[in-house]
Amino acid sequence: MEQNEMLSGMPRRERAVMYKRDHNCCQAVLLAFAPELDLPQEKLLAMGACFGCGMGCMEETCGALCGAQIAQGLLKFDNRRMNPQASQLRAEFEQRCGATKCKDLKGVDSDRGVLCSCEDCVRHAVEALEYLL
């Protein structure tokens, strides 16, 4: 059985976790929504390439959240501003994960430790977007 066939029977959130093995968090979320986005895998990988270790590799906004917001725009954009929807997705992700910045989620410069693993951030980003779709 080919990998894509195997993954197609899995819940989207678990597909994203599987994609995380070989890709960054943003790419993993985008690939999980690939069938609905109707874009070549190479394009999705390119779109998410600069979001590893948080936005711009600076441990800022979590790449998984960025991927979910890119997917949200691709799925729902209708030539109107999407600020309310983007805000809802951010809030839903933060509720599930405890923060939105990569360095906060990973416990960098904090005594709290890891709030949410990368795998769980990817899983929760997919769940949050599915909830809002």
Task: Report the location of each language-model feature.
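Polybasic, low-complexity association/targeting segments
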Residues: M1-M18
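Acidic-glycine-rich active-site phosphate/pyrophosphate-binding loop
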Residues: E2-E5, L30-A49, Q95-K103
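C-terminal binding/interaction regions
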Residues: Q3-M6, N83, S87-L133
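Domain-length accessory/inserted modules outside core catalytic folds
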Residues: M6, M18-K20, L39, L44, ...
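Short cysteine clusters
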Residues: C25, C62, C102
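Buried hydrophobic packing segments
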Residues: V29-F33, L65-L75, A125, L129
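Phosphate-handling active-site elements
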Residues: L37-A46, L74-S87
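Glycine/serine-rich anion-binding loops at beta->alpha junctions
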Residues: F51-A71
